[in-house]
């Protein structure tokens, strides 16, 4: 009996080793988490059927004289029996996969056992089916609670399964005397070994999945902490100052040697090893980063040569580089470096991928918030500059004066003033409006200004109908026209022309132009215009700065406000995508 126990322990040990190996394969771990899906059930059927077949093939042959022999057997003599770990594999299949998997594995294992032959081989087909169904029932109960049977319960179920096996041998064997003799030899070793094996098998599954859950919990905590600490900086946009703070936070919270963030063209920040030559404001040094920016796909490398840094003393030996996206376009990279290649594991890769997705979302949210603030600022500045009490009362006084002279004209101006107020308020709630709406708002504004200063300036709007649904930021043309009226024609009472036009730039873009014949912009202010606030006698220039930021934020740097200025006048223009709002 002791010899049989030791031989069975060897077989169980083999099963346990294979179980441990499987549970350290990510695909199999994911399979265990999806065990209630039919696809996963069929895969579990195949895996546990292979376990069951191996249990049959590596069984211990017992003859009538109780002689034991262990090898790999495909066929057995008619007068011998087989002690094996088949019950363990069928039982675990049912506990993990439920009745379907347990029954399937039981049938496959039983049919193969009948094929192998031996004394009363049909008994083991019957017992295998019973064991699969009963183990599957206990597995189903655990599945409904979204759990696995406990280790102690698994051991008890293993004992019950072996007792069913012994009862089947006693009930269905033709030679009762031989059945009793066989049971007296194998019952205790098989009950002990297979129940312990079942408990160990289930403990490996439970502990591995629990360890993964704990790891995910730690990762989730780290990611949430990173999100909370980095979000305020992402709201500022991806610049050198914010990137430096973000890189420092990641370096402090993660086990990495260095962290770098780049834009599409330059290093924005580098914290940690290699910071002596990976210097912010420099062009991107590594070919690895350039490849990621070009392909838009994550890359992981484990050698200095693959990183592609040309500095001879660079300590960086492994890296993972993740693209950062905004609205589907690559805007930069997040790079994590390691001085020891062994520190870059599957866990770091998963965490890096998750961070890249989160950071890309934060960049988009930050940009959306920036646009919202800019739009609100545009509304406030527009209302302050154009709907100020001074503007309002001047318009009302003009209309009042016209009531006595030209009541129809006064009525028209009152409607224009009403429309102007309404359009300003509506524009403040949208990121883009149609060019047609923008021009209507401009016409309302011009009607009021021309009523106050008759004949002082001429406005020519030359826009083809096919462009009237092009989407533009609110106040785009209004700000440029107002800028010309306020600054271009100082002390000039007549001959002041402003031209507004839209022309085709490319098949997918249009150029929007506002041109005046004023005195031009002084050279000391030209390089500042649109980039920062410019103080003047009649304003700060912040409206143009705000407009330029909104254009670049909505459409990219290629849409930035551009201008040319001479003593004969100034031309402002921007190039926007030919995006049209469909007419209802």
Swiss-Prot record:
Its recorded reaction(s) are:
ATP + protein L-histidine = ADP + protein N-phospho-L-histidine
Residue limits of the GAF domain?
A: 311-362
Question: Do the record's keywords include RNA-binding?
Answer: no
- What would you give as a GO molecular function for this chain, any one? ATP binding
Q: What topology does the record note for this protein and the membrane? A: Multi-pass membrane protein
**Which parts pass through the membrane?**
6-28, 40-62, 88-110, 123-140, 155-172, 184-206
Q: How is it modified after translation?
A: Autophosphorylated on His-390.
Output one GO BP term.
cell wall organization
Q: Where in the cell is it found?
A: Cell membrane
* Its EC number(s): 2.7.13.3, 3.1.3.-
What are the GO cellular component annotations?
plasma membrane
Q: Name one Pfam family in it.
A: His_kinase
Q: What are the protein's UniProt keywords? A: ATP-binding, Cell membrane, Hydrolase, Kinase, Membrane, Nucleotide-binding, Phosphoprotein, Transferase, Transmembrane, Transmembrane helix, Two-component regulatory system
Please list the residues that carry the modification Phosphohistidine: 390
Chief subcellular location equals membrane
Q: Where is the Histidine kinase domain?
A: 363-580
Please explain the role this protein plays, according to its UniProt record.
Member of the two-component regulatory system LytR/LytS that regulates genes involved in autolysis, programmed cell death, biofilm formation and cell wall metabolism. Also participates in sensing and responding to host defense cationic antimicrobial peptides (HDPs). Functions as a sensor protein kinase which is autophosphorylated at a histidine residue and transfers its phosphate group to the conserved aspartic acid residue in the regulatory domain of LytR. In turn, LytR binds to the upstream promoter regions of target genes including lrgA and lrgB, to positively regulate their expression.
Protein's UniProt name: Sensor histidine kinase/phosphatase LytS
The top of its lineage is:
Bacteria, Bacillati, Bacillota, Bacilli, Bacillales
